[in-house]
Amino acid sequence: MKLKFYLSSFLFILSGILFVNAQEKGEMVFSASKKAEKAVDAPSSTTVIDAKTIENRPTTNVTQLLDNVVGLTLDRQGANRYNITLRDGASVFNTTSVVLLDGRQISTIGLQVFDAANTNLSGLDLEKIEVVRGSGSSTYGAYTNSGVVHFMSKDPFKYPGTSIEISSGGLANQESMLGKGNWDIFQASLRHAAANDGGTFGYKINARYSENGEYEIDEATALQTGGQLLEKANGYNIDATLYFRPSSNLEITAQAGISAREGLSWSEFYAEAFENNENNFFSLKMRSGNLTAQYSVSKSESPFDAADQGYYYRTTQTNTFKNTNDIKESQAQIQYDLTLGTTDISVGLDHKLSSFNTNWNSQASTPQEMAAGGLFGRNDGSEMRVYGTYFQTNTSISDNVNLILGGRYDQYTNINEGAFAPKASLMFKTSPTSSIRLTASQATTSSNAQTMFADHLGFSWGLPNQIAGNATQQTFNNPYVTWAIPGIDQIQAANPVFYQGLGLDLFSIYLGLLPQMIPALSQSVVGLFVNVPAFLQNPIVWNSVVANSFIIPVELVGNNTNLEPSDTASIGTETTYEIGYKAELGKFKVGVDVYRQTKENFSALEIISPFAQFPASAATDIADALGFTFGRALGGGLLGQILGQIMGNGFATGYMTLTGAPVGIVNSDQSFMRGPINFGYKNFGEIEFYGADISTEYAATEDISLFANYSWLSQNFFEKADIGEGETSGSTYNLNTPKHRVKAGMSYYPSKGFSGGLSMRYQNSFTANQGWYSGFVPKRTVWDAHFGYKFSQKTQLGVNVSNLLGKKYRVYSGMPEIGTSAVASLKYQF
């Protein structure tokens, strides 16, 4: 009923829009095409979060400003950890959205992880945020298949001066936010900027320190993690930027900085983790006329001292699995814009590189040493390098029709494959401030670094396992069973005909059953005629059993019973057809996007090692073979044959106790060690789904604004024929995101005095498949509020309350319960 109410309200607002006359104005965006253009002319669906919103909504993590954007899911995993999902499946750890700050990628290249708390993002220094929905591959290249989030900072020419902001807040755990120990959020931020009178030189400095407590986990989770998680996280960043503008046609910007964080992260593979790393970066950007070039480099390092390094809370009970990854990244890009007649043209080149060192002990030999950490194991030192070249043309076919064509070729050196990502948009300008867009695009992507290079032993999902990424194929060219039978090592040592393969020889079964058969047969009628211990352990009897031994084939059960090899990484594609409408109609803004997306050749993690169990049908063969052997050893007479058959039947009965349940596992040829379950990746053929994003905004007055938006997916769970598999296949693919999302709210932002805003976010229930955090996710409605008071243009007080009503929820099952949090901030500008 609530969903119907939200949708009815939304449609009512939307219906009023159609009667409003357009006016000559237009919101400008940069990120859709890497050059300035009106939002209604952009070839992609875009949203802009402006300076007024940023200024009036205090946050200690600017990612929170994205939570009301249509088509974007912002998952708050903990007190200060957020993950961004645009038009794609959601992950706990990774994202398929690229995050930029002034053109520099701040989501990890290749690994595709974004942690705003460990960047130099600052609310004091943000001018606006642009969100581009849908494929960005034709412009931004690899791993931008779902969209781009671009944070754009203030320059010292438009925004000189010194600003400070002090924030303090709390989390509602067991008690209220004001309860003992819950008021544990603090942040101090500084921005100083200046420029000369001629506007040719300027600089700015940003500094920030923050700390926060954490939301508590439930008792069941705490039993697996050894108690509650980190008591307090902290982080800081300092950066300086120089601006040189000797003329209107030349601008050079150089930036350097450092950021660090000690805090929590979550992963579907490894669950809760403590992270401790430091990131140093440098960026140089130049614009000369129509030519733009940028180079950036960064280095993220973990502490040298093992006692200070990150670790995973519940991968093992006896040995801490360390969480470290030293990453070096660099990016170089160049773009040139020109106009030929009625066609605007942009061409560009770029290069992205990242290398990884997870500090695996290459000398490890014992299971304990192998399971001590180093996520990339034998793949440590691997790199991901992508070269790309692209173009985009915008041709005015008539006064009201534009054709935008783009394409990009990327070479993925880590898999030695290349791919072309095309895009075409036909724009119909229904008025100066409205347009209809028809778009067809194909994004190219491949596995991220974690999917490719993972290579280690661990205890993910509570079971001993070994994960191997798809950089290397796991095969079963020489398959054999690793047995879980007690005493199997002694049996193998005593057996001259021990069989290593997909079965077990009769003599091994004989030796394995001896400890229970000797007392059992001694107490039977056989014991009246035969010295059972001496007989069954007689070398002559053993030699006879060996001579008559045969192989009992096992039955493979569970996953991958056909012993198919895992798949290696390759190019995947996402093809999207989209119809979009965007308009700024007087006081109204409206955007409607309807799309169909087809994913091809995508990867998912699966168990690839089957279990082995003995077939019950072999009991008769065992009884006959051993009965004959024992009878002959007892002389071959009638009594000997009867006693021999009784003993043979006894061994068959003992064998039956071993059937019906797995007694071993078949590991891949590339296994670290035998026994733990193998996980590997499989490439699926194709899935298809539809989606829609609808957004409205109404400026009731210059200071009062209302918004409502709705996002819809036709399907979020795929199986069998949906993914190109047979009806008997157990494989599934999950987008891990709800089908329905509704967001609405209002804001009041005057130039002085009181200000505030109220918003709600609704999503329907769904079932997630996220490793540790799999399970049912209930529907939820979350209300947020913020209010403040501007004492003057220099002094402002603000309060931001998340989850105002205090109804706790989890992003996914097993994650922390997110209750109310509040932050009060005092901002002063000199």
Regions found by a protein language model. Name each.
Residues 6-8, 193-201, 208, 698, ...:
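Conserved C-terminal beta-signal and adjacent last beta-strands/turns
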Residues 294-296, 302-304, 471-677:
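Membrane-embedded beta-barrel scaffold of Gram-negative outer-membrane proteins
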